[in-house]
Amino acid sequence: MNTLPLDEDSCYEACAGREHAWDGHFVLAVTSTGIYCRPSCPARLPRRENCRFFVSAAAAVAAGFRACRRCRPDRLPGEMGWSRREDLVGRVVQAIRDGVVDDLGVAGLSERLGVGVRQLNRIFREEVGATIHQVNRTRRAHTARMLMDHTDWRLGEIALAAGFGSIRQFNDVMRAEFGTSPRGLRRYPEPETARGGSGRIRLTVRLPASGMQAATAMRAALAAHAVPGVEKFESGTLTRLVNTPAGAALARTDVMGRVELDLPALGALAPTLGAVRRWLALDADTATADALLSRDPQLAQLVAERPGLRVPGVVDGAEFAFFTVLGQQISLAAARTVQERFITSHGRPAPGLGEQWRLPPEPAAVAEVGENGLRESLRLTRSKAATLHALAIELAGELRVDPWTDRGETRSRLLGIRGIGAWTTEFIAMRGLGDPDACPSGDLVLQRALGLATSRQVLARAEAWRPWRSRAVMHLWTKESYL
């Protein structure tokens, strides 16, 4: 099964109209040429009988098609629509985007999801039209193509950085994806790559992104919450520390898709790119969300003023959960102060990056400090120290805060911690879980913006926004300058 967002005739009509809004939702494959394209491809529309439609680029490649060199579907954000799905297949797609398959393998992923490998592969293939390995292979190929566009690296370096196990595998996959060898794809642009004297790797890339018209609001939201030690906002640019299995990396961005990377090794590239895409919500389906929210009289003007507004994600889910608890019921300025104190007191050195950067502490290390130690080092109330300690114990155990976890189970675990209520849980869901339909209905600023008095009234009002309640909340918070 290849579950398309439209019936095939409607897909063809969208391609005939070259509708950019459908880019990333499906691809058009042409049997007479053997290529697949984005729906908005400017090439002449093929005859209907020569068209096939696939829900993902990987499914088209698995069926024997290669990427169009004119519309470059590999430059699109990842397949959209998956972020609002919390079923098993949606969670696997999110995990592939985050590089989890490279890290754990399919067997490790299936264990984390609590599903047998064969069952997981079968369900995924029926829904997506390609195997987990094939979708992950397509992700690697698109990363490699991006590096060819932006660096002068040797092909062997590109293969390693993109996650390929060998040059032969790299050559075979690139030929299957693009119809030619890696050498045939090379254009040798003006390089934006440098190697520091410390052996670190620096390069600039432009990541595919959808709807960046509201980048100013996104930048303001991230800047307002930037915590020294792990983040820095300076001259309109955000810099973020990323912890990878290969070491500590830095990502500097204008949030428009341009990213300057400072890497400890080639192996840090893929996890850093995944973290940045998640942090900036670059795969968000902004067009579909805007279309639905624009129907609401109270939101229509806000959407018109900030089309494409996204809800920021996070780089480190455990860190974000700690920060959210530390920021409960205090001002934003006070929250940043105690969050910085947390990083300074309990964070770890970031090798190769200087003293201004600190890796966030592992949950087990925070749990080891104990309630009294946290209360004294962070100057917390007894109740907040107890909540932070209980959260650390859960995070050191089975609690996960990431976009590919079970959202319902994570919410239940969070609500089971004394001191964590609905607002904290929904805020963590909005950003840490990447849930597009989270709704912190008890938020006083949200209630004021809507002119409502109770959480129940907000929930009733927000029913019309499903499955994009998080985006609606972001619009209302931005309107109220509550970032």
Language-model-derived ranges and their functions:
Residues 1-483:
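HhH-family (HhH-GPD) DNA N-glycosylase catalytic core used in base-excision repair
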